């Protein structure tokens, strides 16, 4: 059974074709600059170098057609025709309170996802456009929606409600939803396998650290709290996002900097985080290079980020009354040994200690704890596409 996984953004579309018989990626690619000049599709097979084709992609329908064309191409393709695709799994950022699990897509589901646009105006519209484009081109192939938010639907109300007038929650659905759920769930399950223990007997803190970052407290396989909130802006300082700040700063800035709602949203989402602090970059590789060259603000940005992660780990140890494993995942979590070391340092009183040599390993599943550590510290590469494909198979079989 071959599953096509689609992750549609506003001007890009990432995809993977996975053979679920042995869970191997047959091909993966990217359609970029959709609706913009100089658009292209890039595809690679296995370990082969990617092939890049300049192609006019006026909209997402053009992009999906380009994907099918590339997958079935005599030279760069991996299947003979579209009929070899058994199902399509779509990543959808926000399911609101309407979805607490992945679902087979039908018109009712589409309408419910559209109703979530209010709470996810940046992310859900391109996700919807991607589904509609697939439905036009592959009308007879079953499609599944996998939501970033559903793993966090197990959070208790005292964890997800904000202390605003309760009527605002009832009227607008203002509450913590959490994101990166597919990743948090996947790495928690992998941690359970690595530790050879049932998820039901484990307390795990998963740290998804990339350009967007979030922490999750996973107790007995369920998310009981997470750092992102109503939007992905809450929580840690990230690549370009401020993370949690005093809400009065918003009104102060609007007045002092003469900003409107869009202006202050752009400031908090696109110009803040480690980019805003450092003035250098949102990329940690650039920050480390600048810090090594003596840039104190780049060094400060890294310290602020690591301090934030450390605080969430402490918070979640408290709410779970302990922890068995801490997991690092995503681009920074998997590959940045300096950041991992800064986060874990000075937590040995909790039994959290890492081996410096093991910590140098990058991008592979590894236990980096010392032999005598009471808490296991694991590095686990995330695989959201495989997780989406597995959910798709589960629902369409």
Curated annotation (Swiss-Prot):
One example of a Gene Ontology biological process annotation: acetyl-CoA biosynthetic process
Annotated metabolic or biological route of this protein: Metabolic intermediate biosynthesis; acetyl-CoA biosynthesis; acetyl-CoA from acetate: step 1/2
Binding site for Mg(2+): 7, 384
CDD domains according to UniProt: ASKHA_NBD_AcK_PK (cd24010)
Annotated binding of substrate, by residue: 91
Pfam families: Acetate_kinase
Catalytic activity: acetate + ATP = acetyl phosphate + ADP
Listed GO MF terms: acetate kinase activity; ATP binding; magnesium ion binding
Amino-acid positions noted as binding ATP in the UniProt annotation, renumbered to this chain: 14, 208-212, 283-285, 331-335
Active site residues according to the UniProt entry: 148
Disulfide-bonded cysteines: none
This protein's record includes keyword Disulfide bond: no
GO cellular component: cytoplasm
Co-factor remark: Mg(2+). Can also accept Mn(2+).
Keyword vocabulary terms for this entry: ATP-binding, Cytoplasm, Kinase, Magnesium, Metal-binding, Nucleotide-binding, Transferase
Cofactors required: Mg(2+); Mn(2+)
Functional note: Catalyzes the formation of acetyl phosphate from acetate and ATP. Can also catalyze the reverse reaction.
Subunit structure: Homodimer.
Record-given protein name: Acetate kinase
Organism, as annotated: Ruminiclostridium cellulolyticum (strain ATCC 35319 / DSM 5812 / JCM 6584 / H10)
Taxonomy of the source species: Bacteria, Bacillati, Bacillota, Clostridia, Eubacteriales
């Amino acid at each position: 059974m071959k599953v096509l996984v689609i992750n549609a953004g506003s001007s890009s579309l990432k995809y993977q074709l996975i053979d679920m018989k042995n869970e191997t990626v047959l091909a993966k690619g990217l359609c970029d600059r959709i609706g913009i000049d100089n658009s292209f599709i890039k595809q690679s097979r296995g370990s082969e170098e990617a092939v890049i084709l300049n192609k006019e992609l006026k909209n997402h329908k053009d992009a999906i057609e380009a994907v099918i064309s590339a997958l079935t191409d005599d030279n760069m393709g991996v299947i003979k025709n579209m009929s070899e695709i058994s199902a399509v799994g779509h990543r959808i950022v926000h399911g609101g309170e309407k979805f607490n699990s992945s679902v087979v897509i039908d018109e009712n589901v589409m309408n419910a996802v559209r109703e979530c646009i209010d709470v996810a105006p940046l992310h859900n519209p391109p996700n919807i456009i991607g589904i509609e484009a697939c439905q036009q081109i592959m009308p007879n192939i079953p499609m599944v929606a996998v939501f970033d938010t559903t793993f966090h639907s197990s959070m208790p109300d005292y964890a997800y409600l904000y202390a605003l007038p309760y009527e605002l929650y009832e009227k607008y659905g203002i509450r913590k939803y959490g994101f990166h759920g597919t990743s948090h769930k996947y790495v928690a399950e992998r941690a359970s396998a690595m530790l050879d223990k049932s998820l039901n007997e484990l307390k795990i803190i998963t740290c998804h650290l990339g350009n967007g970052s979030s922490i999750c407290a996973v107790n007995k396989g369920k998310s009981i709290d997470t750092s992102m909130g109503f939007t992905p802006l809450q929580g840690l300082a990230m690549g370009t996002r401020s993370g949690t700040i005093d809400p009065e700063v918003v009104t102060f800035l609007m007045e002092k900097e003469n900003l409107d709602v869009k202006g202050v949203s752009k400031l908090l989402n696109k110009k803040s985080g480690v980019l805003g602090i450092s003035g250098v970059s949102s990329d940690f590789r650039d920050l480390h290079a600048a810090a090594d060259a003596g840039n104190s603000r780049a060094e400060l940005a890294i310290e602020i980020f690591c301090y934030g992660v450390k605080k969430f780990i402490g918070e979640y140890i408290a709410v779970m009354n302990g922890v068995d494993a801490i997991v690092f995942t995503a681009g920074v979590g998997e590959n940045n040994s300096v950041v991992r070391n800064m986060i874990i340092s000075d937590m040995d009183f909790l039994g959290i200690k890492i081996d410096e040599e093991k910590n140098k390993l990058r991008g592979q599943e590894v236990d980096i704890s010392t032999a005598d550590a009471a808490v296991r510290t694991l590095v686990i590469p995330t695989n959201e596409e495989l997780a989406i494909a597995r959910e798709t198979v589960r629902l369409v079989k």
